[in-house]
């Protein structure tokens, strides 16, 4: 008895230790999370999410506990006394711990096992809190699937939870059945005896009841498979095709009924032995399963579908096209034609000054190295990324590149107080115009140095301290030290560094002993408890990276990989794009190969997140209120979201179309722009992203932000957009280009410009080839490469301009000794010409000048012919020739001065003069005038060639 009592005490002690361990493991994290969310005024998020988890945990634990506990109780009850069972050895019951294994002890053991299994089930299923909330608060999409007529919101918001619940039911039943079979076999109630199968009737009834439970779960699974079938890939159609709709769907309905019938037969055998009937039912069930879901679909596919696949699959291809376009918002794209003239007009530069001034020459992949070398200033600062944005600079709309100066991940002197008390924040940012360079090929900085010096008032920030950022390291304690102490390094300066004391509201109060103890345990750093730096007003700042903050505030959103810094009036802000997604959407082709979005079938950029870089405040603004998923989350978290109009206007001016979302859309659009089933089936017009050459390697061109005047719109003026040229799959010529608009009121509009298909329009890779084939350019690049420097060709930018294209590629040199990229040349190209000069303007003048010379030569040949006929001219024709000579002289002066706009104007006027006074040819007939083409390339008959060329 003393041994038994000691065993019970040990069990109680182990139970207490387990509870304490669980509390210590789980509770600190929950308390810390609650404090953190409360500091941001989002405590309701904590209670909603954790409440849903607790509810799921408790419900699943109770259901699983009742199921396992009840089954184990029946199992033990069906086992005869152990000393009389087949376990007994020489009439003695087995012992455990020196005590007989009685029925009561076995019952308690069964309850322990049931409790452990229930805990595992409950812990796993509680992670489905998001599915539960979406299911509970689901609304309507307003559009039905094309097969069952069920609202699409069912697939996106309800089906995932139902599938999880069905899987849990089947898993519970299967595990319970497996445990019962094992228990009965060990107890000798089921087994092979004397060459035959023997089973206790009570054991069979118990197992039969659990088998019914399993079959009911299977029947439910077959029913849910009806909806899952609309999302499965295979064959020509992604989703349910001809075979699925006409064979598999009826077979699934049959399997639902057959499974229920089989469950009924098992139930009948609980009370009346009808093993023969049960055997026939089981065999028939297998025949239906294999025949209906394997053999019949295969035969129909081989005999009916494959011989005329396009014909029979046409309506389902249409479903696939329509639903995928809906899932990725491709149906909202506006499609227009773009003439893509082969030549730029002579006055292209003068007519598009603002666009030319905003062509991005600085490649972010190289500019980051320049920033690091020239502007990190101290070893404890680092630049991690460069973002492209736009600002109004003294009334001019300019494209700007910006990078925050953040704390490095590894301090030079990595002591505890340096890491957590003294080096607490980054400082300011660096920015430059995208198309300007300063001395020696470096950027022309708009904001630079420490403290930041800005050339424009719109870039000035009163408080440039960055306590929160993209890569902000570890936690820190602010303010530290006694009131009045300034322990934090604000920024370095000559002589003596500038120190400061944090005066913001970011962070969780850590002044009390209990909170210091809590955070010491949670952070695994007991210096928090021991340090003298912490005072009553001290706060601990943690989860300081933008991605971390958004993930803890809204873990149900996917975050874009590129948050970007914005200059505010008083401080810096980060803007991040967040997405609502679903892995369930009928007939939608899922995302493959894009990290973080694998398996996604529906996506919307529904949220813009703003993070205060000084206080750490997180604000979420709904940018797509029509999205049914964000509508659901607004019902779940009524205090979390704000309308986009509530965002400060200064920040609204900096929202942009996100690159991740655009790339996902373009990966789908490259195929799903083919809306005709036959074209889609044959991939007759498949597009792809073009290749470009970067750092001597071929790679896929990335979308890029550009500031230009979008063709075909009603109002003229620059606007900020994300652009990507497209080429036919397997070819390098350009077939179209896509622009995603970012400026209000047109934010979110995507325009696709399709190019003529009856002639060649050079794509980026073909322009790269033309550059390689240019002897002068190739020789110069090779020469630089041989002089101890590396030549890197930056990203090629395609600029739509004057119904044509301008191609621009910067050339950088990187010395082997000092890794500072310097922009040495800029290549400009059109469809016809290419030039490399020191600046973009010089390259443009060279390219356009070659076109003008060609135009001039054509015109001068006709001028020479006209001069030869002057003797036979009438007085009116003589007067016209005199005026023509004056215009020729003015055109020559303009050409020599590089004034192509005036040159074009004079040729236009010359054309008009010659049209009004036609000149006789040498045979006495009047030749028809030659008109200017739509590119602005002028040809007209004129006088003496030397009048224009100056005799050269």
Swiss-Prot record:
Native species: Salinibacter ruber (strain DSM 13855 / M31)
Similarity comment: family membership: Belongs to the UPF0182 family.
Keywords: Cell membrane, Membrane, Transmembrane, Transmembrane helix
Protein name: UPF0182 protein SRU_2225
A GO CC term attached to the entry: plasma membrane
Record field: compositional bias (Polar residues): 931-940
Membrane disposition: Multi-pass membrane protein
UniProt-annotated stretches for the region Disordered: 917-952
Bilayer-spanning residue ranges: 12-32, 52-72, 109-129, 168-188, 207-227, 247-267, 277-297
Main location, first listed in the record: membrane
Family annotation (Pfam families): UPF0182
Location within or outside the cell: Cell membrane
């Amino acid at each position: 008895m003393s041994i038994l009592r000691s065993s019970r005490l040990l069990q109680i002690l182990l139970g207490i230790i387990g509870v304490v361990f669980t509390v210590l493991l789980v509770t600190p994290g929950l308390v810390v999370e609650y404090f953190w969310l409360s500091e941001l005024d989002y405590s309701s998020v904590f209670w909603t999410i954790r409440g849903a988890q607790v509810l799921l945990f408790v419900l699943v634990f109770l259901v699983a506990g009742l199921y396992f506990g009840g089954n184990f109780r029946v199992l033990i009850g069906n086992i005869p006394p152990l000393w009389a069972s087949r376990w007994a050895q020489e009439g003695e019951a087995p012992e455990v711990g020196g005590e007989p294994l009685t029925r009561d002890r076995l019952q308690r053991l069964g309850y322990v096992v049931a409790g452990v299994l229930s805990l595992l089930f409950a812990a796993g299923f509680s992670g489905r809190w998001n599915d539960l909330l979406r299911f509970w608060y689901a609304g309507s999409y307003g559009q039905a699937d094309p097969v069952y007529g069920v609202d699409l919101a069912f697939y996106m918001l309800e089906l995932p939870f139902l599938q999880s619940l069905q899987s849990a039911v089947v898993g519970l039943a299967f595990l319970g059945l497996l445990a019962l079979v094992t228990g009965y076999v060990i107890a000798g109630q089921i087994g092979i005896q004397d060459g035959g199968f023997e089973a206790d009737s009570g054991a069979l009834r118990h197992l039969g009841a659990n088998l019914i439970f399993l079959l009911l779960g299977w029947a439910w699974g077959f029913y849910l498979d009806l909806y899952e079938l609309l999302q499965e890939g295979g064959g020509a159609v992604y989703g349910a095709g001809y075979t699925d709709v006409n064979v598999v769907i009826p077979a699934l309905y049959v399997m639902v009924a057959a499974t229920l019938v089989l469950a009924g037969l098992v139930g009948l055998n609980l009370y009346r032995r009808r093993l023969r009937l049960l055997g026939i039912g089981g065999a028939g069930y297998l025949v239906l399963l294999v025949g209906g879901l394997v053999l019949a679909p295969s035969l129909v596919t081989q005999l009916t579908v494959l011989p005329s696949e396009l014909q029979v699959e046409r309506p389902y291809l249409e479903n696939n096209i329509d639903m995928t376009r809906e899932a990725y918002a491709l149906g909202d794209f506006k499609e227009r034609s773009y003439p893509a003239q082969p030549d730029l007009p002579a006055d292209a530069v003068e007519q598009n000054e603002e666009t030319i001034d905003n062509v991005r020459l600085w490649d972010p992949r190289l500019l980051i190295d320049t920033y690091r070398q020239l502007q990190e200033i101290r070893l404890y600062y680092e630049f991690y990324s460069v973002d492209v944005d736009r600002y109004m600079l003294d009334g001019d709309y300019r494209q700007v590149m910006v990078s925050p100066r953040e704390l490095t991940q590894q301090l030079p002197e990595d002591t505890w107080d340096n890491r957590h008390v003294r080096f607490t924040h980054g400082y300011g940012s660096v920015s430059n115009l995208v198309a300007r360079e300063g001395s020696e090929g470096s950027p022309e900085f708009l904001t630079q140095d420490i403290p930041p010096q800005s050339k424009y008032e719109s870039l000035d920030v009163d408080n440039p301290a960055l306590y929160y950022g993209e890569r902000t390291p570890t936690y820190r304690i602010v303010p530290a030290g006694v009131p009045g102490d300034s322990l934090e390094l604000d920024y370095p300066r000559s002589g003596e560094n500038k120190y400061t004391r944090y005066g913001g509201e970011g962070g969780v109060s850590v002044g009390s002993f209990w909170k210091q103890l809590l955070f010491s345990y949670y952070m695994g750093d007991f210096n928090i408890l021991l340090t003298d730096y912490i005072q009553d007003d001290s706060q601990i700042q943690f989860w300081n990276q933008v991605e971390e903050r958004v993930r803890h505030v809204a873990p149900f959103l996917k975050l874009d990989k590129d948050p970007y810094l914005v200059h505010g009036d008083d401080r810096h802000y980060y803007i991040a794009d967040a997405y609502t997604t679903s892995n369930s959407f009928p007939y939608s082709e899922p995302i493959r190969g894009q990290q973080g979005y694998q398996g996604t079938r529906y996506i919307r950029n529904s949220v813009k997140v703003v993070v205060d870089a000084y206080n750490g405040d997180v604000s979420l603004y709904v940018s797509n209120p029509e999205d049914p998923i964000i509508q659901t989350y607004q019902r779940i978290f009524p205090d979390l979201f704000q309308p986009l109009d509530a965002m400060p206007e200064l920040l609204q001016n900096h929202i942009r179309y996100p690159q991740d979302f655009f790339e996902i859309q373009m990966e789908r659009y490259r195929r799903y722009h083919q809306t005709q089933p036959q074209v889609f089936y044959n991939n007759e017009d498949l597009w792809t992203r073009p290749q470009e050459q970067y750092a001597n390697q071929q790679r896929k061109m990335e979308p890029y932000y550009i500031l230009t005047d979008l063709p075909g719109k009603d109002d003229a003026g620059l606007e900020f957009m994300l652009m990507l040229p497209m080429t036919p799959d397997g070819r390098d010529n350009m077939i179209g280009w896509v622009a995603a608009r970012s400026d209000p009121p047109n934010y979110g509009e995507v325009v696709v410009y399709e190019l003529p298909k009856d002639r060649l329009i050079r794509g980026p890779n073909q322009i790269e080839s033309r550059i390689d084939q240019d002897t002068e350019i190739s020789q110069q690049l090779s020469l630089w490469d041989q002089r101890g420097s590396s030549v890197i060709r930056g990203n090629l930018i395609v600029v739509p301009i004057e119904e044509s294209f301008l191609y621009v590629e910067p050339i950088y040199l990187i010395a082997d000794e000092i890794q500072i990229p310097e922009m040495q040349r800029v290549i400009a190209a059109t469809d016809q010409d290419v030039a490399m000069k020191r600046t973009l303007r010089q390259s443009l003048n060279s390219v356009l000048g070659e076109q003008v010379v060609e135009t001039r030569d054509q015109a001068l040949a006709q001028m020479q012919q006209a001069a030869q006929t002057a003797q036979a001219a009438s007085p009116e024709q003589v007067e016209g020739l005199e005026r023509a000579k004056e215009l020729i002289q003015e055109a020559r002066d303009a050409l020599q001065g590089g004034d192509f706009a005036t040159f074009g104007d004079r040729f236009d006027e010359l054309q008009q003069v010659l049209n009004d006074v036609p000149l006789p040819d040498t045979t006495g007939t009047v030749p028809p005038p030659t008109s200017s083409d739509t590119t602005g390339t002028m040809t007209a008959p004129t006088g003496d060639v030397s009048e224009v060329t100056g005799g050269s």
